[in-house]
Structure formats: C-alpha cells, structure tokens
Amino acid sequence: MGRIIGIDLGTTNSCVAVLDGEKAKVIENAEGDRTTPSIIAYSQDGETLVGQPAKRQAITNPKNTLFAIKRLIGRRFEDKEVQRDIDIMPFDIIKADNGDAWVQAKDEKLAPPQISAEVLKKMKKTAEDYLGEEVTAAVITVPAYFNDSQRQATKDAGRIAGLEVKRIINEPTAAALAYGMDKKKGDSVVAVYDLGGGTFDISIIEIDEADGEHTFEVLATNGDTHLGGEDFDNQVINYLVEEFKKDSGMDLRKDPLAMQRLKEAGEKAKIELSSAQQTEVNLPYITADASGPKHLTIKLTRAKLESLVEKMVKATLEPLKQALADADLSVGDINDIILVGGQTRMPLVQKYVTEFFGKEPRKDVNPDEAVAVGAAIQGGVLSGDVKDVLLLDVTPLSLGIETMGGVMTALIEKNTTVPTKKSQTFSTAEDNQSAVTVHVLQGERKQAAGNKSLGQFNLEGIRPAQRGAPQIEVTFDIDADGILHVSAKDKDTNKEQKITIKASSGLSDDEVEKMVQDAEANKEADKQFEEMVQARNQADGLIHGTRKQVEEAGDALSDEDKAEIEAAVVALEEAVKAGEKEAIESKTQELIQASAKLMEVAQAQQAAAGAEGQPEDASAKQDDDVVDAEFEEVKDDKK
C-alpha cells in the first residue's frame, strides 16, 4: 500500500503531514511555508491560483478570490449561517439547482467541494514533491461537529482532487492523537479546545496506555460549525467600517475592493494584538469622493478588540459545559487541556479557557499543525505502519427518523461510539398502507422539523393490513467516517430498500465524477499553461540577451549577420505575442542558430582581451608564487 497522507483542510489555512519513519512530519509547500492559506483565485488569464499566490492578488480580484469555503460545504442556501455570510463575503454565494449554497466565480457556478478540491490538490502536490512519488490516498480531518452532509461533501472534495479518502477523522481527535502518541505511560483525560478559522469544537478524550498500546476514546463532543476566526475578523472589519463612516460619511461596504483591503488589514491587526497592546490600521487611498481620495487611519487597542469579540469567546463555554455533562465528568477530572486552531493564540481565549478549567492549557502542542500530524498518524494506522493504536470516535449528533405526529425518534443517540449499527421496528399509520416514507433526521430536537433533514426514501409493496400490523425494521449503520447508511425492511415480505445518506441535496455520483474528469482535464491544462510560461520566459530572456550581445559586438559583427539575427529576434517576438508554444519553441531554436556567429565574436574578443592582459614573465611569476603545504582531507558527513 502506498503512503497515506494526513490533511487538515482548514477554513483559513490547510496543512499536510506524512508519516516519516515513526514520526509524522509536516511538509513545507512550494513557497516554503508549513501551512497554506485555504484561498483559491481565478485569474484573468484562466490560471487557478491556490494559497499564498491567491492571497496576494485578492485585493485586485475580490469577486474571483474565494476563501472560507469550508463554511459553505454541505450547507443549504437557505441555512441562516449561509445567509449571514452572503452579506459579508466579497464573492457571490448563490442557490444551486439542488438548493445547496454554491459560489459564482469566473462566470461559472461552482460547488464548495469542487473549490475545496483545489486546496486538496495543492496539499497532494506538496506531499508528492517531498516524497518523490504519486500520492493517491489521504486521511482528511473535519470539525467534530460536522453533520453527515458536511462529511460527505468533504469526501466528495477529496475524490474530485484525485484522492481516495481512506478515513474522515474529527479534528480534536486528530490533535489528541498527535499529543497522546508522545505519552509513554499512564492514562489521562484531555479536553481538546479547537477554535479554528470557521468552526469551534470541544472534545473530551480518554487516552489509555498499557504495555505500549494506546487507546483513544472520545467520551463526548460538542461545538459550533459556524464560529471561528473569520467571525472575529468580521467584528474588526465592522468596527473599522463604522469608524470610517463616522469620520467620512462613506460606507465602505459598497466597495468590494475596499472591503478586501479591510479584511487583510483587520486580520493582520487581530494577529498583532495577540502580542502587542495597540496597533494602527493604516490604509491610504481606501476610497474617493468628489473632494478627492480618502485615507483610513484608525488605532486599535487589545482592550477594544477584546470588547468586540468577548461575546463570541464566551459562546464557546456553553459547549464545554455540555460536553463535560455528556461525558459525566467534572472540570477536576480533566488532566490536560490542548488548544488547537490559530484563534487560540488570542490571550482572551486562553484566559477564558484557563479560568473555566482552573489550569493552564499545554503549550507544547502546535495549534496549527497538530491536526495534520494526527491525521498522518491515523494514515499510518490504516496502512499498518503504526501498530497498537485504537481510535474510538463518536457521532456528534443524534440520528433518527420522523414518526407519526412529526416527532423525531432517535435510533442512535449523540456521542455513540462509531462505527455502530442499530435497528428498530416500526409500523404503518393507516389501514391498508402499501408504502412508508423513511425520513432520516440529525439533531437533538424532539420536533422533526427542528432537525437537519439528511434525506428520505420509500419502502413500497407492503401487503394490505390494519394499521400497526406490518413490521418495518429500520436499520442505521454508521461507518468509521461517521457517514450513515440506512435500510428499511418489511419483515413479512422481506422487501428491503437501502440508501447511503448523502444530503437532502448534495452532489450526485455523476456530478462528482464529472468534477473529477474536469479536474483531470484542468491538470493537463495547468501543465500546458506552465510549459507555455516557461517557453515565454526563455524566449524573453533570449531576446534581451541577444540584443545586448549584438550591441556589445559592435563592428566585429557584419551588417549581414546583424540583419539575420534581428530578423530571428523579431520572428521570436511575434511568436511570443501570438502565444503558440510550439511556434515559440521553434523560433527560439532558430534564434539560437542565427546567434552562433555572436558566440564566435564573443569568444574571439575574450581571447584577445586575455592575450593583451598577460605579462611576459607570467609563467615565472606563477612558479615563484607556488607554496608547498601539507593538507588534510576533511570529509563532510552532512553531505
């Protein structure tokens, strides 16, 4: 089996790691960074940019620069969280034909898994460049509180990126895996507080170690899949917009370019205030009116930032209490607190966590890398490279069906260890009912309408009988990825209907397959684009160098040779303008051949210059300068 890489597909940043011997190694990307911004941009010339290159051009291309797509993945357009984002995102969030939240960019409708696949492709390429081999399998992490639709959409993204997703693993569980593998002995209960760019999770995990065997058992999990650093940034941006409006009377929300500049500046200010008490947001020429350009200069203190976001930090405490209650533990039972996600670097977050648990969180876990490291370890477990590790994760929300009166009847309660399988027998609600509809739900509300609808299907061909007589066995089967498979069976006729729950909408297999093929086609297009750029760059360099050499050659080059070379230069310039790779390469070779005379002239001039500069007694002088010396060969073991 080939290598299974671990990918932390984050809202703000992503990270990739691989098992290197017994240790997981975080891999640096092409830009030399250990994390990659989860930003995708579509440039005017058709190039798809991912990561830092996409981030750099965001200000000038706000409509086609997509970020925080994880907040949309597996979500319906009508979801209140999506509606909230529509007002603050500079790009267009639209309603897809199936009711999902999609994005409009480069005059195309794009599904969130399709966009996230671009980030996963970058992670895949980063790993391949490091390993020197093709990578086809991965463990991808998701927030523990992701529902079934969001998990399925993440798997779809992996498939579109050309990866076989061997396992979907919860982010806090992955972080605990990274932390716990270094523990040599003893048992402990850890709380993983994961506040990332777009999501918040808390997981209570028991780590048992005995005779070298590690068991990681998730006791309870809770969270909010729409609370994270992006929301903190938005609070800062709103404050800056309002302050500028007070001073100038102008609303920057109507200017996408200005808002993109504000987003970058707001995020930077927030990060700076984790170590400084005050910073200044300075954006010259932020906008203009009839009187001329306007500049934004606003001082922001840590105290002000904390007042803007304190409500959101406090909002993370309720899930902490609920998770402890679900695990039947008290604060005193927690041995260690692990902080995960970049937003946990904020002093206010650390203060609240410390006060809640009555002890300092650990400082030896990298909040940006722990999740990817844990995913890589899980990859090692699945490939057989890591032995003696057992991971027992849970389903974050209850799963059930709608029964008579619009009630949700749970078959699998929240925090049940997965994989798991549960069956329950139901019956008909009316006399002579020939079919039943199985409506699958996820959530904690007793009222069916208050829960997330995961899908529905019909079981037909039930024999006519009085209500309550037929025996319909409904089975829920959750796999290790936390994805649900449902079946309904008529015990009388043995007729059965099965489905894998995708979402009430989601991408069909055909749509995913089409996106996989599009990605493959784009892979070839990207390769051709890269080759074209290389050919153009080589041609430009040759044109510049040749003209410079012709000038330096002067009269040593005949007019006839000069004319021949200039004609070849012009032909190459025309080929570059036309943009045909084969023509550029052909004309490049013709110019190299035409410039052969130039090389002869240059060599002759060098030889002449060398002869003039050599003194008559040079050889004697060289002999006089020779010094006999002992030497020792030094071998460099590092090479």
Curated annotation (Swiss-Prot):
Keywords associated with the record: ATP-binding, Chaperone, Nucleotide-binding, Phosphoprotein, Stress response
Region listing for Disordered, in residue ranges: 602-639
Entry GO MF terms: ATP binding; ATP-dependent protein folding chaperone; unfolded protein binding
Pfam families in alphabetical order: HSP70 (PF00012)
Phosphothreonine sites (modified residues): T199
UniProt biased composition (Acidic residues): 625-639
Gene3D superfamilies linked to this entry: 1.20.1270.10, 3.30.420.40, Actin, Chain A, domain 4, Substrate Binding Domain Of DNAk, Chain A, domain 1
Xref: InterPro entries: ATPase_NBD, Chaperone_DnaK, Heat_shock_70_CS, HSP70_C_sf, HSP70_peptide-bd_sf, Hsp_70_fam
Residue ranges the record marks as coiled coil: none
Keyword Flavoprotein in annotation: no
Biased composition (Low complexity): 602-613
Similarity remark: Belongs to the heat shock protein 70 family.
Job description of the protein: Acts as a chaperone.
UniProt-listed PANTHER family: HEAT SHOCK PROTEIN 70KDA
Name recorded for this polypeptide: Chaperone protein DnaK
Species name: Pseudoalteromonas atlantica (strain T6c / ATCC BAA-1087)
Gene, per the UniProt record: dnaK
